[in-house]
């Protein structure tokens, strides 16, 4: 919509008329940038996400989606020949692909629930994605004779994030990808009541593929109840796809450890870390760990950069 600023005064209406840029992805050849923009309608009280592609120098900006569906989180795949993205056209949020000009759209996943974020493995053979898992019994579950009851009995924390009642937890899933669809879906936190990524703001940036596509690093605060509510002590875990084993590499750190990223050669892992438990606004430091030192009896403690 048009942005109207009258009398050189920024108004709420003008702010709502501005598009909000979301996810950004650079093509493998570094020549193009795909990104999402959210537009808001005050009369309809809702937003709509569209995708754009432009040249890396800022020229030739073009909109590649124009519809009522929600398209978001563009990612270049298949050597830059396709753009993968999330779309709810099928009735739930799934991974789709299309050409960089917006043609030849195709649905890639048909997962039973909404997919909230995703990342293809470096070798393109697997898909890491985020989906909600039920962790709390609803009133109807506890009292099947009262199927329409909406009351909630709270006996413990954490029962709410801002405007959202806690009934589910986001879990990371790994699946095989053959270029057209997924199979052999595995919940990395199967049977665990924890969140990864962490609510309320965490997304796919809290998980990372190893360059060899054989491991996934993820952020998790493995606590529940009151301990979860008062603590910021999250950790970086590494999940081995071949063995199914998980290793905590930041157990000594007491504050937030988030957003892991592997070095291109897979020898190091970097992440953001806060020093103290319980302080959400503590200083974020950048840590780098030499992964070859993890299994030594007295590993070298990583120092902030």
Language-model features: where?
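Single conserved hydrophobic/aromatic residue that forms the stacking wall/gate
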Residues: 294-305
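Hydrophobic beta-strand positions that form the internal "hydrophobic ladder"
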Residues: 33, 80-84, 127-128, 216, ...
